[in-house]
Amino acid sequence: MALSGNVLTAAQAIMKDEQAHVLLLQAALGSRAISKPAINLAALKVGFNSQNEFLTLSRAFEDVGVSAYGGAAPLIHDSKILGTAARILATEAEHTGVIRELIAQSTGLTVTALDNQDILPLGSSNGRLVSADDNGLTPIRTPSQVLNIVYGGDRFRGGFFPDGVNGAFNAVTSLA
């Protein structure tokens, strides 16, 4: 699959930011950083056959990422790490906006909800340009809710992370 035009430009910019985020988080966490878990891209079953699939997958990653940072913020007690996470969250929100705009501009592209909190982009049923509810707030997800999505509904492992993830939050404990 070859990306082109604004999708390629966005993908390259987002890739650069994501690589920088990994380095920033590793530096902020220091010895508390966890090792990279195994990743199974094939489990996603979308994202690599067309530009529209790439946008669908990118939207899922970015929207879940934004909601994950929002949900994790109350759990971060180190002000330096919280400050870094807040700045990354702002960038991730911009990524989400770019991807959602590209989806809105795509002909015939609709996406399905990831869970009951998902706010779909324009072009989808009840879609919105930005991922915000009637109060102008983006959804937040607890670590368990994020893991439920990336594990494909499993409690301990599966989906995108076939062997689970490392760290204190590694299992789905509650979806409330």
State the predicted function of each range.
Residues 1-176:
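All-alpha RGS (Regulator of G-protein Signaling) helical domain and cognate RGS-like helical scaffolds
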